[in-house]
Regions:
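FAD-binding subdomain of flavoenzyme oxidoreductases
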Residues: 25, 57-105
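Catalytic-core signature of thiol
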Residues: 18, 27, 48
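Loop/turn elements at helix/coil->beta-strand transitions in domains of secreted/extracellular proteins
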Residues: 11-12, 50-54, 99
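Short, solvent-exposed loop/turn and secondary-structure capping segments
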Residues: 4-8, 26-27, 104-105
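Structural recognition of the beta-strand scaffold that forms the well-ordered cores
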Residues: 13-17, 33-36, 55-57, 92
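Glycine-rich N-terminal segment of FAD-binding domains in flavoprotein oxidoreductases
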Residues: 1-21, 37
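Short active-site loop/helix that positions an aromatic residue
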Residues: 44-50
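Short, structural beta-strand-to-alpha-helix junction motif
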Residues: 31-32, 39-44, 62-64
Length: 105
């Protein structure tokens, strides 16, 4: 099932769509945010604008969060904070066997 306006694979591959994982949750102390893999940076920025906050994220709102971070992530804040991926506190991942694991730097 191709996804319009997205990078797609041919009919022999498996496409995992994460668009339903769109949760956004700011920590109580407002120092970290939980971002679901279905979000694009525009959604993250819009959510954080209500708190007058931002993140070391993508430079274009239509860019997906997971692909950007897994690719390193060049941000407008790169000179001050480095690559966006270096600012990730934790990844929660589902392994091929169904186990859920948390990975931290």
């Amino acid at each position: 099932m191709p996804i319009p306006d997205a990078a797609n694979i041919d009919s022999r591959g498996v496409l995992l769509a994460s668009s339903g994982f769109d949760q956004l949750k700011l920590s109580e102390d407002k120092s970290t945010i939980e971002v679901g893999a279905g979000n694009k940076w525009g959604q993250v920025y819009e959510y954080l604008a209500h708190y007058k906050l931002t993140v070391v994220g993508g430079r274009a709102g239509l860019v997906g969060v997971p692909g950007f971070l897994l690719g390193g992530g060049i941000s407008f804040f790169g000179n001050e904070y480095g690559w966006a991926s270096a600012n990730v506190v934790q990844y929660d991942c589902v392994l091929a066997n169904g186990d859920i694991v948390s990975s931290t730097p």
